Amino acid sequence: MAFKDTGKTPVEPEVAIHRIRITLTSRNVKSLEKVCADLIRGAKEKNLKVKGPVRMPTKTLRITTRKTPCGEGSKTWDRFQMRIPKRLIDLHSPSEIVKQITSISIEPGVEVEVTIADA
C-alpha cells in the first residue's frame, strides 16, 4: 500500500494560550500607574489580548492611638492611615511571552503577583 502525497504540510502543534492575571499593589499611585502603563504597552507591542487595568477598591488601614504615653492629661488622639491601591491586568497569551513582558524594570515599592490559568 502506497501513501499518497496530499501536498499538505504537517500541522504544527499550537502553543497553549493561558489566561494570565497580573495583580499590582503599591502605596504610591504614580509608580503603580507607571508600571501598569509599561506592562500594557509591552503586551500591545506583542499583539496580545489585554483587559485592564481594572482599578480595585483602595484598602485603607487605620491606627488610632493616644498621644500621651502615660495616660495623663487631655485625651488627644493621633490618627494614622495607609492607603493601598490595587490594579488587575488580564492577558491571553503563552506563558513564555509573559516572561518577556514582565521582565521590564519595575518601580521600587510595587508588588507584582502573576497568576496563570488555562484559557
From Swiss-Prot:
GO terms for biological process: translation. The modification Phosphothreonine is found at T9. The keyword Chloroplast does not apply. The modification N6-succinyllysine is found at K8. It is found in: Cytoplasm. The modification N-acetylalanine is found at A2. One of its GO terms (cellular component) is cytosolic small ribosomal subunit. Its main location: cytoplasm. Polyubiquitinated by ZNF598 via 'Lys-63'-linked ubiquitin chains when a ribosome has stalled, initiating the ribosome quality control (RQC) pathway to degrade the potentially detrimental aberrant nascent polypeptide. Deubiquitinated by OTUD3 and USP21, antagonizing ZNF598 activity. Ufmylated by UFL1. The modification Phosphoserine is found at S93. Keywords: Acetylation, Cytoplasm, Isopeptide bond, Phosphoprotein, Ribonucleoprotein, Ribosomal protein, Ubl conjugation. The keyword Ligase does not apply. GO terms for molecular function: RNA binding; structural constituent of ribosome. PROSITE patterns: RIBOSOMAL_S10 (PS00361). It holds the Pfam family Ribosomal_S10. There is a cross-link at K4, K8 (Glycyl lysine isopeptide (Lys-Gly) (interchain with G-Cter in ubiquitin)). SUPFAM superfamilies: Ribosomal protein S10 (SSF54999). InterPro entries: Ribosomal_uS10, Ribosomal_uS10_CS, Ribosomal_uS10_dom, Ribosomal_uS10_dom_sf, Ribosomal_uS10_euk/arc. The modification N6-acetyllysine is found at K34, K75. PANTHER family: 30S RIBOSOMAL PROTEIN S10 FAMILY MEMBER. Component of the 40S small ribosomal subunit. Component of the small ribosomal subunit. The ribosome is a large ribonucleoprotein complex responsible for the synthesis of proteins in the cell. Belongs to the universal ribosomal protein uS10 family. This is Small ribosomal subunit protein uS10. It comes from Sus scrofa. The gene is RPS20.
